[in-house]
């Protein structure tokens, strides 16, 4: 949720953020109205309760002549308090709904606009000239790494098996990511992949995008699309110790996405699938440290991309393409030869205090006063990386060179066609 102090003191900042995202700025005015109504209702109910308490005390010391009128007054006040409390509950619910409807306020410098309005910050490496390149699925099938047909037979479209050295390649990639994280002070975690509704909502993944999330209705649990979700919930309703700097976690999990809005997109191969594996960095820090920590996450992502030896670029994602929780997001996109373009391999988001405010995660400032923490997240390795590895390292004879950093995990320097 956004900071109410900011909303009340400078609502135009929130309106501009909404416009940059392509969202309705009228939601800001609706929240201001709901906030005023809620505060008025609270004040009215408090005042009536105080009056009721005073009237009740007065009955005890009243004369027989005064008592009937005072009793009636106390009864009337009790009814007024009941009505005021009902109004307070209604205004609280309306306020919460209005508050939850507004996404995070973007940071200065984030490009306005939609999916195609990103800013390219850097291009790293030159795409290699490849005559008649094969796509990752053709390579994966010929090398015995990917089996889409049996994945579909078992689970339906957008499912797959990683087989043999394909499984080793992914496991090696994720182990490499986890090793990098641990070497940089992250605590490794294997979190639950099922979470309660309040945790999913707290991270900003419900609301307008609820249809993209798998839900187990009988158990009222959600399958996570990223380990960001359980790691954000890890310190819900807690005061964390940030006295020695940020808390950094690296979560390794399977991830599940319905891809409800992607019909017809990336139907071939493993670029867009319902289940994949990922190592995700997640950070709790003070709001003052958040922007510097965002740059650190990006640097660690770049270090991982250097390990797989592929050309990539870094983009500053436009406001309209940000998730509800993100105030700023950087994507690293790797070159995909058969598509002649760059595709996202990593993202890192600065969620400022948005998630922690929803999840009641705080820290103590220098004066010992509890304050809302900031949260950030960033991909360190995921299944989709195999697409870029296979396509960029393919050889004329149909083999694929294994990046040096992964050779020890896969057990060979070259993946050879089967049969």
Swiss-Prot record:
Binding-site list for L-serine: 226-228, 280, 379
Pathway(s) per entry: Aminoacyl-tRNA biosynthesis; selenocysteinyl-tRNA(Sec) biosynthesis; L-seryl-tRNA(Sec) from L-serine and tRNA(Sec): step 1/1
Reactions catalysed: tRNA(Ser) + L-serine + ATP = L-seryl-tRNA(Ser) + AMP + diphosphate + H(+); tRNA(Sec) + L-serine + ATP = L-seryl-tRNA(Sec) + AMP + diphosphate + H(+)
Keywords of this entry: Aminoacyl-tRNA synthetase, ATP-binding, Cytoplasm, Ligase, Nucleotide-binding, Protein biosynthesis
Main location: cytoplasm
Protein residues bound to ATP: 257-259, 273, 344-347
EC number assigned by the record: 6.1.1.11
One Pfam short name: tRNA-synt_2b
Enzyme class label: ligase
MF terms in GO: ATP binding; serine-tRNA ligase activity
Subunit structure: Homodimer. The tRNA molecule binds across the dimer.
Classification via PANTHER family: SERYL-TRNA SYNTHETASE
Recorded domain comment: Consists of two distinct domains, a catalytic core and a N-terminal extension that is involved in tRNA binding.
Function (record text): Catalyzes the attachment of serine to tRNA(Ser). Is also able to aminoacylate tRNA(Sec) with serine, to form the misacylated tRNA L-seryl-tRNA(Sec), which will be further converted into selenocysteinyl-tRNA(Sec).
Protein name, entry field: Serine--tRNA ligase
Organism: Mycobacterium marinum (strain ATCC BAA-535 / M)
Gene assigned in the entry: serS
């Amino acid at each position: 949720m956004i900071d109410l102090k900011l909303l009340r003191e400078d609502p135009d900042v929130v309106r501009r953020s909404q416009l940059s995202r392509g969202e309705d700025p009228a939601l800001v005015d609706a929240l201001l109205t709901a906030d005023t109504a809620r505060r008025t209702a609270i004040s009215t109910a408090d005042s009536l309760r105080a009056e009721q308490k005073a009237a009740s005390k007065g009955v005890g010391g009243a004369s027989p002549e005064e008592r009937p009128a005072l009793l009636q007054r106390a009864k009337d006040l009790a009814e007024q308090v009941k009505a005021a409390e009902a109004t307070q509950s209604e205004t609280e619910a309306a306020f919460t709904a209005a508050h939850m409807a507004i996404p995070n306020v973007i940071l200065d410098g984030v490009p306005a606009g939609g999916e195609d309005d990103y800013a390219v910050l850097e291009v790293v490496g030159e795409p290699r000239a490849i005559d008649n390149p094969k796509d990752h699925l053709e390579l994966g099938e010929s090398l015995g790494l990917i089996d889409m047909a049996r994945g579909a037979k078992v689970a339906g479209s957008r499912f797959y098996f990683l087989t043999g050295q394909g499984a080793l390649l992914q496991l090696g990639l994720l182990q490499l990511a986890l090793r990098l994280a641990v070497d940089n002070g992250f605590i490794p975690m294997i979190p639950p992949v099922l979470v309660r509704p309040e945790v999913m909502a707290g991270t900003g993944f419900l609301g307008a995008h609820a249809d993209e999330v798998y839900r187990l209705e009988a158990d009222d649990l959600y399958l996570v699309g990223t380990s960001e979700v359980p790691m954000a919930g890890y310190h819900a309703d807690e005061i964390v110790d940030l006295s020695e700097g940020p808390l950094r976690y690296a979560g390794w999990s399977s991830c599940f996405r319905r891809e409800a809005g992607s019909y017809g997109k990336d139907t071939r191969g493993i670029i867009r699938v319902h289940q994949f594996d990922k190592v995700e960095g997640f950070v709790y820090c003070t709001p003052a440290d958040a922007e510097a920590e965002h740059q650190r996450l990006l640097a660690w992502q770049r270090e991982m991309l250097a390990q797989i030896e592929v050309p990539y670029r870094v983009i500053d994602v436009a406001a309209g393409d940000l998730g509800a929780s993100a105030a700023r997001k950087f994507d690293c996109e790797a070159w995909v030869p058969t598509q002649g373009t760059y595709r996202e391999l990593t993202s890192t988001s600065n969620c400022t205090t948005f998630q922690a405010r929803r999840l009641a995660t705080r820290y103590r400032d220098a004066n010992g006063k509890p304050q809302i923490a900031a949260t950030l997240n960033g991909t360190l390795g995921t299944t989709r990386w195999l697409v870029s590895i296979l396509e960029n390292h393919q050889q004329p004879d149909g083999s694929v060179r294994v990046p040096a950093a992964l050779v020890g995990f896969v057990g060979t320097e070259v993946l050879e066609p089967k049969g």
